[in-house]
Amino acid sequence: MGIIRIRGLLAPACCALVLALAPVPVQADTVLDWNAVVLDVIRLMRLTPPMASRELAIVNTAAFDAVDAASGLPFQPYHYDGAAVADASPRAAAAAAAYRVLSRLEPGVAARAPALAARMQALYERDTRGGAPAASLAAGIALGEQRADAIMALRAHDGFNVSPPPYWGSAKPGAWRPTPPEMAPAMLPQWATMPPWTLRSPAQFRPPGPPPMNSGKWAGSVNMTQALGSAAGRARTSERTQIALFWADNEGTETPPGHWIDIAAGIAAARRLDLVDEARLMALLSTAEADAAIAAWDAKYAYAAWRPITAIGEAAASGNTEVTPDREWKPLLPTPPFPEYISGHSAFSAAAAAVLARFFGGDRMAFSARSDTPELRAVVRRFTSFSAAAEEAGMSRIYGGIHFHFSHLDGLAVGDAVGRYVFDNFFQRQAAIATSVSAP
């Protein structure tokens, strides 16, 4: 894997307002273009990774069901039991679905970023006012809006916006408790019990838990993070520092799920996928990412394990003499305010890698990725396989000092299981179905 620097490369981490000023493409990759808009909205609204994964999944399942129905139902719908709609424009259906979801879920975009709102409107008009007869466009708009409303209704009471009591953890050795500097309660405990998009339950692929604190495996992982993840960085190479920052995807960026959406969109554009395949790819990927979030949060709150900054500072309480306590130790990256085990980055990345490998016919593929971290906007990292990128993304959290190696490995296992399950059980090709001439 090499690193190249491209002078003048547009920074994906620029604020949504700036990104929204880009001209609307003449050649319409409708699903990919709308996913780019969703990423801008995620940046603008500073969504957390679980929140971002939910928004991406709502947009993409709505768009997929709309495109699928308008294209003769070649694939299993996600949440639609009607007939195919032969007279509907698939492109208009996709645009109407995406536009309606974003307009309803994020009504504050227009006031906070008028340029982004204008871009959304321009994309909508591009895809709904030409390229097909007026009746077909109207049918597509109606279909897309209906599918958007159906998905939003399906997820309206999934608990995303509940306000549970503050989760402060425990002072027990090994247990999570607030971390400096904010010392805030744990974020989004409700995500651990959210109804999944595809899984039978949040705990379907629950991992075994952290190793015992008196074990060599636990000590080895703590020592690895203590050495490689320190803010001082004496044992960390410059490339590993770059990797930690490259995949950081902190608040105000596209987030880890969005990073993989961006990677997939680049590959899909290069492969010139048709509209149905674009919609299916993004539906597969976004639901896998959404369920990876739920599965990861299930594990995080089932085991409620302490973060490295706590474990290293209070290592004496572990009873493991193979670890040296250091209360002055600080991580390279800010510690996220929720339990450590498992690594969400590893779960998100492995789920994406599993979906992409199956969709494109194998794990090995040469592709590049960019970062939303502002100081790395001119850096492109190249990979030869999806699994290699997932491995690097997960290891980035160890280099950043906020995860342990066992959490990375178990996060990869959970994410891979989620991605395989989604691909094998949803959005499958089906036999030809009789079409209808009217929108449901």
Where in the sequence are the language-model features?
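Acidic/polar surface patches and capping/hinge elements
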Residues: 28-440
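Sequence-pattern detector for short linear motifs
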Residues: 8-10, 57
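Bacterial Sec-dependent signal peptides at the C-terminal "C-region" and cleavage site
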Residues: 21-29
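Bacterial N-terminal signal peptides
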Residues: 11-22
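N-terminal secretory signal peptides that target proteins for export/translocation
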Residues: 1-7
